[in-house]
From Swiss-Prot:
Organism encoding this protein: Bradyrhizobium sp. (strain ORS 278)
GO cellular component entries: DNA-directed RNA polymerase complex
Gene: rpoB
Similarity field: Belongs to the RNA polymerase beta chain family.
UniProt entry keywords in alphabetical sequence: DNA-directed RNA polymerase, Nucleotidyltransferase, Transcription, Transferase
Top EC class of this enzyme: transferase
Oligomer status and interactors: The RNAP catalytic core consists of 2 alpha, 1 beta, 1 beta' and 1 omega subunit. When a sigma factor is associated with the core the holoenzyme is formed, which can initiate transcription.
Descriptive protein name: DNA-directed RNA polymerase subunit beta
High-level lineage: Bacteria, Pseudomonadati, Pseudomonadota, Alphaproteobacteria, Hyphomicrobiales
Documented EC number(s): 2.7.7.6
SUPFAM superfamilies in the record: beta and beta-prime subunits of DNA dependent RNA-polymerase (SSF64484)
Gene3D superfamilies, per database record: 2.40.50.100, 2.40.50.150, 3.90.1100.10, DNA-directed RNA polymerase, beta subunit, external 1 domain, DNA-directed RNA polymerase, subunit 2, domain 6, RNA polymerase alpha subunit dimerisation domain, RNA polymerase Rpb2, domain 2
Reactions performed catalytically: RNA(n) + a ribonucleoside 5'-triphosphate = RNA(n+1) + diphosphate
Function comment: DNA-dependent RNA polymerase catalyzes the transcription of DNA into RNA using the four ribonucleoside triphosphates as substrates.
Xref: CDD domains: RNA_pol_B_RPB2
One record GO biological process: DNA-templated transcription
């Protein structure tokens, strides 16, 4: 893989993969971005917007007419205005990043002719109406809601359409399979059709009481005869003198058990003796021999069913109704009437069952009216039905596009399942659809066809942001519609404008509710770039309209064959959500119908082409797909005679000519996180699951370091997550500092656009998880970059590659029991050199409110606080930036007015002497909470409109304005430099026809000539070339616009700064303080590798006590070898060996670099690199300086990539170890640091990539002496967040009881918990120095007494001494 990028030349990864990647991996957050773009369609395409997304919502709700039909409100188009605040401002001010939506509406008023009722247009008014703010997506696929970044997770739900299923024999005791069909619309009523144990078919609407399915068919307008004709064939039995002649059909008579002999009606021969069963084969042979008809006796007709009403044509008397069973009595009547031909239903009880006929005879409804009334009673119990209302209700259930929508997906699925051909614009049900569903269900009961698998990905679809938002907005608009209709009827329609009819609140509220409190709108996991990307690619089966944890069974959670290449089989949470929350596979994408697709290479006549086709799970079932690692020759033909393929959920060997497709890449079946685990194929799946989940919890470290052993996915994740910054166009680095990079573009130059790109870097921002987001530039002034090159690293990235942890030297050996049960032993070097140190930024805020007793005040003047405690505060009472603070320090001084309480004489005296402000305020300052200590890095002060700003707020504002002005001036200077240099290039060497004052006509314009004039006069030069002059004019126009734009942007930002802030009601002022906390690794912190090998740091050992190698290198970490065999994650051992080889090769390269620096001979370096990398394209193109830089970068270790399922083999690892001059076993002699003696056996030593996880002991450890109590029970609260106590639970009580520690137990249950009086007495006793106290009644006992009283049981406490126990004599 040639990595010709800017960063790719600074550090080259040796690639072990053998399979070339044919398909480009789609952008990893495409799922989110594409979906929302399609919903918003911000830029209207020419020819108007297509009917999807927001446009479709408006089209479906509008036009709205009033009740009388005299006026109509039509939708014309919509557009977005630019957002009021940009992303950063929204983050800082706690606003939502949203754009106002303007909708053009047209109000049409009609004149209605009273006699003819004809309408004529009287008046048309058009107006733009504001319809609320619609949140916009940021560049990285997230939303900023109230200042926090959120992600809308995509939802997996059951696809609309029709599903056939059975109860697996669970309902009825006999274990009989009861079949059921369900028609699920996108919105509207569900229709269930099901069998019961007696084989009668019922229908349910919306899971209500069941009705016979024939009632539903009556309601659809069929009568009994038509129903039977729909489901059964008609057989004509003809009278012959020996009995009846019946046409013979092999399919119908298969499995027929004979009672009498079967006789050929034409020849009179016996074709099958009595008591035998006619097999399928025998029936077919009889047909082939030419058997046309059978002879049946009169008895054999009994038990059959009449197919149509038999009526006396003269009198109209009905002898038999359709579906009636032939009995002796009926047979006599028919014989008397002399029927020669009897039409019978083709029901043989073997191939065709009498279910519909039995349902019809069991149905008490006989007409359409009865059936409609019955359905109405089920749907609206208690309301008396009328024919009109019943008909209207039934019509609106399934046939009204307003109430019922199958959606295009539902219609496509239904057509496929029932083999219909309705267009996908037909979104409601039709009579044919319902009948086809019933027919298919009955066929299933007769043993024809298969039931559906609801966990097949062809039956589950994904609803992404756009679609979820569309549904929400539709709900909002429908609420609005009712209000609009009412308002249209109540106002004078001739004088109003559309604006007066519309209240946009419901629509805006629906959107706000969705983003704020929907289960699918989640607080983004921002621990590191990988966790962001994974969160955006998540698929959840939970949420509104989805499953619930409790009801989801095993099948839904299980891995299904159709997940291959679509959903990762590995990455899912452990615990109650397992299998319900999944992750999209690396190459998967969602198609327009919401089904997940995966790419395959097309195979033509046994040859694999490079054509890539995306297939959904339904389409894939028809084809045979080969694995990505099948051996191919140079021409793309399969080298083996049999190729293992997947077909219809099975794995089958095929000959090469039968193969249709082949996987594009071995990593297409796993998700991003799993694809980052090297040697994933050597890990047990459970551990791989933990590995991929724990990488998401890795905290960004102070110094990121890319892994020696990677998989080649690291760069992709860093780029797509937006953590690392990529160049938008190629160019040259013009200017650079820690906060921004300026690139002068050299490609895609457009005279109407600026020739300069400015990239702002984020400096020490707080993420959602309080980790630190900091970007730093990788380029120098004068560097040449191409489009897409990484120019700045972000958190957890190193030279444009994801770097979640550090490479550390690991020895697998026990060490004094300190690595028992997965504990981890660390060397002091790790702490001293800040290897696993991370920075966390905590945010604290305080609000000054306007209370009933007066306003709260932020001030330095706080009662009863020493000057020492105020040393970090400025005169406004706010802490300085850069101050070091620890738990309990004041960050912001605040006082709150106290309620008036009766004053003691002393207080009155003080009041009289010192005036008002003696004691009427209390200290409510913001203090640093326990367990936090760090440095103040930022302070923000927010003031309400019209409140005077304090000194600190003004200082911050001035600083901010200065920064903005500097930015503007810098941009202006860059723009000037850029434009004038381009202008000089254009004019240089041209013949001038005019110029500024003093310029001679027809002189050649040169740089020297230009330099005589100030730059602003250069525009006056004119050359004879018209095309050139047009370009210069365009450039000047663009220059003037840019200049104006810069100034305007500056003024806007300053105006926003000075305007004052929108604060919650009642808040006058708000201060936010950010504290940076440096967390070194310490015992109790959790660490993990990438293979699910997690542990807790148990001890930090002085470096001299750690085991060391022969060259004196000490191990950094000692892990327990027993953690490997039972866990079956051997990948970590392979990684250790390969990492060891990487480090060894790094040492080799370091030696050649030193040789180059001392002797200026580059040859050894080139040769070493060639030995390691072979014929790598990138290395061949480097010059000596670049080679030297590469050598420096590789001297710690040579990075390699071993892709999942296609990585380094054992032989490759051995070869690398030999290249590095190491022992091929990967083991080394290790010496004990404490004694200096070698250990008895060789030890596996090598480099593992270790992560520090976001479970830090500092965040968990907690202690309380006194603190808050619960109001009702008066017991201490629980949990660290509430500063609670430790629960002394049931088992702890048992322990004290077992020891007989009665007084300790009493103390625990009373004075240390909820005996309120006792608590205060203990305090008083301690103050007096007394050590006796008495326990009282615990408050929780009083609560119990009160509860009993509330149940009507009066419980009284008698506080009296008991008399002596009665003696036995008195008792007698």
């Amino acid at each position: 893989m040639a990595q010709q990028t800017f960063t790719g030349r600074k550090r080259v990864r040796k690639f072990f993969g053998h399979i070339k990647e044919v398909a480009e991996m789609p952008n990893l957050i495409e799922v989110q971005k594409a979906s929302y773009d399609q919903f918003l369609m911000v830029d209207e395409p020419t020819g108007g917007r297509p009917d999807e997304g927001l446009q479709a919502v408006f089209r479906s709700v509008f036009p709205i007419s009033d009740f009388s039909g005299t006026s109509m409100l039509e939708f014309v188009r919509y557009e977005f205005e630019p957002p009021k605040y940009d992303v950063d401002e929204c983050r800082q001010r706690g606003m939502t990043f949203a754009a106002p939506l303007k909708v053009t509406l047209r109000l049409i008023v009609f004149d209605i002719d009273e006699e003819t009722g004809a309408k004529s247009v009287k008046d048309i008014k058009e107006q733009d109406v504001y319809m609320g703010d619609i949140p916009l997506m940021t560049m990285n696929g997230t939303f900023i809601v109230n200042g926090t970044e959120r992600v809308i997770v995509s939802q997996m739900h059951r696809s609309p359409g029709v599903f056939f299923d059975h109860d697996k024999g669970k309902t009825h005791s006999s274990g009989k399979l009861l079949f059921a069909a369900r028609v699920i619309p996108y919105r509207g009523s569900w229709l269930d059709i099901e069998f019961d144990a007696k084989d009668i078919v019922f229908a349910r609407i919306d899971r209500r009481r069941k009705l016979p399915v024939t009632s539903l068919m009556f309601a659809l307008g069929l009568d009994g005869e038509q129903i039977l004709a729909t489901f059964y064939k008609k057989l004509i039995y003809k009278r012959i003198k020996e009995g009846w002649r019946v046409p013979f059909d092999a399919n119908r008579f298969r499995g027929y058990s004979t009672v009498n002999d079967l006789i050929d009606a034409d020849t009179g021969k016996v074709v099958l003796e009595a008591g035998k069963k006619l097999t399928v084969r025998a029936a077919r042979q009889l047909q082939e021999k030419g058997l046309k008809a059978l002879r049946m006796s009169d008895e054999e007709l009994l038990g059959n069913y009449i197919a149509e009403d038999l009526v006396n044509p003269k009198t109209g008397e009905i002898y038999a109704e359709a579906g009636e069973e032939i009995t002796d009595k009926l047979f006599k009547v028919l014989n008397e009437q002399g029927y020669k031909d009897l039409p019978l239903l083709d029901i043989d009880h073997v191939n065709v069952g009498p279910y519909i006929r039995n349902t019809l005879s069991a149905d008490k409804n006989m007409t359409r009216e009865d059936a409609l009334f019955d359905i109405y009673r089920v749907m609206r119990p208690g309301e008396p039905p009328t024919l009109d209302s019943a008909q209207a209700m039934f019509q609106s259930l399934f046939f009204d596009a307003e109430r019922y929508d199958l959606s295009a997906v539902g219609r496509v699925k239904m057509n496929m399942r029932l083999e219909l051909d309705a267009p996908d614009t037909q979104r409601t049900l039709r009579k044919e659809d319902i009948l086809a569903v019933i027919k298919t269900l009955v066929d299933l009961r007769d043993g024809k066809g298969e039931i559906d698998d609801i966990d097949h990905l062809g039956n589950r679809r994904v609803r992404s942001v756009g679609e979820l938002m569309e549904n929400q907005y539709r709900i909002g608009l429908l609420r609005m519609e009712r209000a609009i209709k009412e308002r249209m009827s109540s106002v004078d329609i001739d004088t109003v404008m559309p604006q007066d009819l519309i209240n946009a609140k419901p629509a805006a509220a629906a959107v706000r509710e969705f983003f704020g409190s929907s289960q699918l709108s989640q607080f983004m996991d921002q621990t590191n770039p990988l966790s962001e990307i994974t969160h955006k690619r998540r698929l959840s089966a939970l949420g509104p309209g989805g499953l619930t944890r409790e009801r989801a069974g095993f099948e839904v959670r299980d891995v299904h064959p159709t997940h291959y290449g679509r959903i990762c089989p590995i990455e899912t949470p452990e615990g109650p959500n397992i299998g319900l929350i999944n992750s999209l596979a690396t190459f998967a994408r969602v198609n327009k119908y919401g089904f997940v697709e995966t790419p395959y290479r097309k195979v033509k006549d046994g040859r694999v082409t490079d054509e890539v086709v995306y297939l959904s799970a339904m389409e894939e079932g028809r084809y045979r797909v080969a694995q990505a690692n099948v051996p191919l020759d140079a021409k793309g033909r399969f080298t083996e005679d049999l190729v293992v393929c997947r077909h219809a959920g099975e794995v089958v060997p095929m000959t090469p000519d039968k193969v249709d497709y082949m996987d594009v890449s071995p990593k297409q079946l796993v998700s991003v996180a799993a694809a980052l685990i090297p040697f994933l194929e050597n890990d047990d799946a459970n551990r791989a699951l933990m590995g991929s989940n724990m990488q998401r919890q890795a905290v960004p470290l102070v110094r990121a370091e890319a892994p020696f052993v990677g998989t080649g996915m690291e760069g992709v994740v860093a780029r797509d997550s937006g953590a690392a910054i990529a160049a938008r166009r190629s160019g040259v680095i013009d200017q650079i500092d820690a906060t921004r990079v300026v690139i002068r573009a050299t490609e895609d130059l457009d005279p109407t656009k600026s020739g300069v790109d400015i990239y702002r870097l984020m400096k020490f921002q707080r993420s959602n998880q309080s980790t630190c987001i900091n970007q730093r530039p990788l380029v120098k002034v004068g560097d040449i970059v191409k489009k897409g090159d990484i120019i700045a690293d972000g958190p957890s990235t190193d030279l444009g590659e994801l770097a979640l942890g550090r490479n550390v030297l690991v020895a697998f050996m026990p060490w004094n029991g300190y690595n028992f049960e997965d504990s981890i032993l660390l060397s002091e070097r790790i702490v001293k050199e800040d290897v696993f140190t991370s920075i966390h930024i905590e945010e604290f805020e305080v609000m000054a409110r306007d209370t009933k007793l007066g306003p709260e005040e932020i001030t330095r003047d706080i009662p009863n606080v020493s000057e020492e405690a105020l040393k970090n505060l400025d005169e406004a009472g706010i802490v300085y930036i850069g101050a070091e603070v620890r738990a309990g320090d004041i960050l912001v001084g605040k006082i709150t007015p106290k309620g008036e309480s009766p004053m003691t004489p002393e207080e009155k005296l003080l009041r009289a002497i010192f005036g008002e402000k003696a004691s009427d305020v209390r200290d409510t300052s913001l203090r640093v909470p326990p367990g936090v200590q760090g440095t103040i890095v930022e302070v923000r002060v927010f003031n309400r409109h019209g409140v005077d700003k304090d000194e600190r707020a003004l200082a911050i504002e001035r600083e901010e304005i200065e920064r903005l002005a500097k930015d503007r001036d810098d941009e202006q200077a860059i723009l000037d430099r850029n434009v004038y240099s381009r202008l000089a290039d254009m004019l240089d060497g041209r013949q001038g026809i005019s110029g500024p004052k003093g310029f001679k006509k027809d002189t050649k314009i040169t740089r020297a000539v230009l330099d005589e004039y100030p730059k602003s006069q250069w525009w006056l030069f004119a050359a004879s070339n018209d095309k050139l002059m047009a370009e210069i004019e365009a450039m000047r126009k663009q220059y003037d616009e840019s200049k104006k734009g810069l100034e305007q942007r500056f003024l806007d930002k300053v105006e926003k700064l000075q305007r004052g802030d929108e604060l919650p009601p009642g808040v006058m002022k708000m201060v936010k303080v950010f504290v940076a906390v440096k967390r070194k690794i310490q015992p109790g912190d959790k660490m993990a590798g990438r293979h699910g090998n997690k542990g807790v740091v148990s001890k930090i050992v002085p470096i001299e006590d750690m085991p060391f190698l022969e060259d004196g290198t000490h191990a950094d970490i000692v892990l327990n070898p027993l953690g490997v065999p039972s866990r079956m994650n051997v990948g970590q051992i392979l990684e250790t060996h390969l990492g060891w080889a990487c480090a060894g090769l790094g040492k080799r390269i370091a030696q050649t670099v030193d040789a180059y620096l001392s002797k200026q001979d580059v040859k050894p370096l080139k040769e070493t690199l060639k030995r390691i990398y072979g014929e790598d394209e990138t290395i061949k193109t480097l010059n000596d300086n670049e080679l030297l830089e590469l050598g420096h970068n590789l001297s710690r270790g040579v990075p390699i990539a071993t892709p999942v399922f296609d990585g380094a083999k054992e032989s490759d690892i051995e070869e690398m170890l030999k290249l590095a001059g190491m022992d091929a076993s990967g083991q080394s002699t290790v010496y004990d640091g404490r004694t200096g003696d070698p250990f008895d056996r060789k030890v596996t030593v090598g480099y593992i990539y270790m992560l520090k996880l976001h479970h830090l002991v500092d965040d968990k450890i907690h202690a309380r002496s006194i603190g808050p109590y619960s109001l009702v029970t008066q017991q201490p609260l629980g949990g660290k967040a509430q500063f609670g106590g430790q629960r002394f639970g049931e088992m702890e009580v048992w322990a004290l009881e077992a020891y007989g520690a009665a007084y300790t137990l009493q103390e625990m249950l009373t004075v240390k918990s909820d005996d309120v009086a006792g608590r205060t007495k203990v305090y008083e006793a301690i103050v007096r120095g007394d050590d006796t106290f008495e326990a009282g009644i615990p408050e929780s006992f009083n609560v119990l007494v009160k509860e009993m009283r509330s149940l009507g049981l009066n419980v009284d406490l008698h506080n009296s001494k008991l008399g002596p126990a009665p003696t036995s004599e008195a008792a007698e």
